[in-house]
Structure formats: C-alpha cells, structure tokens
Amino acid sequence: MRSVDLALYADELAAEASMLAARLERARCRLQRAALEREARHALEATTVERLEVLGVLRCGETRAVRAEITDLTASLRAVESLQAWVEERLA
C-alpha cells in the first residue's frame, strides 16, 4: 500500500477519533450536569423546581442511558485509536 494512501487513511481516522472524543466529552458533561441538577432539586423548593422544569432549565436527565453512551463511546474511541496506532506503525 502506498504511503499516501496510508496518510489519507490516518487523517480520516484522526477525524473520526476527534469526533468520538468530542461526543464523549459532551456525554460526560451531560452526566455532570445531571448530578448538579439532582443536587439543586434537593436544595430548592418544589415550586421553584417545577418552574425551572417548565422553563427547561432543569431537565430530567436519564443518567443510566448517558452512562451506557459513555461506555459505548469509550470502547469505540479505543478501537479507532488502536487502528490509528496500527496505521501509524505502517507509515513509519
């Protein structure tokens, strides 16, 4: 295989890894936000919480689904990074 083809493939993999890393970071942020919102719900009055929910400021975060997404994205990112390492070895 030509080194140009490998370099192009490496670029595609880098873009994919970057996209997965960004999605993973957003999922982690959603999980952190859910924890903050859960804490706020306990600290604030019920009427305030209801008002904030109506406004969309407080959301009912499904943490189980977010945790599953984080697990999946982490595995996907590791797989892409493994392939990247293999391609980089071939380029060297």
Residue map of PLM features:
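Short, charge/polar-rich alpha-helical segments
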Residues: 1-36, 67-71
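Extended alpha-helical coiled-coil "stalk/arm" regions
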Residues: 21-59
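Long amphipathic alpha-helical coiled-coil segments
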Residues: 65-92
